[in-house]
Amino acid sequence: MTGILAGKVALVTGASSGIGEAAALALAEAGAAVALSARRAERLEGLVARIAAAGGRAVAIPGDVSSEADATAAVEETIARLGRIDILVNSAGVIQAGGVESLPLDEWRRVIDINLLGTLYTCKAAIGPMKAQGSGDIINISSTAGRRAAGIFGPYSTSKFGLTGLTEGLRQEVGGAGIRVSIVEPGATATEVAGGISDPTMRAAMSQHVAKDGAMQPEDIASAILFIAALPPRVNVSQMLIRPTIDTAAM
């Protein structure tokens, strides 16, 4: 495909649904070849078919970013199958309701392993190849919960605050090598993420909240990701906060 990202290769984690899926479609439409990573292989294959039907190129790389081996393999396989890696979109994420006292530690670990450490693993694997190319874009998807603590979503908010520190530190570390590092912080967005909340009352409340007419759609966030990736190499949007026009909650 031709487009503003023609010749570029992107890896998108969390590509089986929500923001990751929308980002993959937007990047492919803009001309990038896209590697799709997530745990749900059948959804990835469906997305590969959709992109191919529209004239784009995509490959599926199933895996779990909370596994360092899987996350590293996603980067390595992207390069092996598509030739390089120009854009890394870290969109894989989960949410859980609860606080320090109420939520078991294994739930805290699961959220932090996916949202924070999973991003660390893919970033670490991508830095070397991007340095060798002299360029690259790393775009980490966070949340407004990474700007203002949301006590009822303790591990989620904690992981997103950590992601802010990781992103800014990495930007300082690799900017001199021509690698741009950005964080995108969406407010309420209509995705499937609330389905992972174990408490049924909180799950229903969160699902209802993101289903409101004023909630943003994954395509809205994908447009922001595309904007960042398409900017001239001299420009790095280090942080982008995106809220619904009618913003009724912290997240």
Show where each model-derived region lies.
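Conserved glycine-rich cofactor-binding loop
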Residues: V9, S16-S17
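The beta1-alpha1 cofactor-binding region of Rossmann-like NAD(H)/NADP(H)-dependent oxidoreductases
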Residues: A41-E42, P62-A74, L105
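Residue(s) in the substrate-gating loop at a strand-loop-helix junction
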Residues: S143
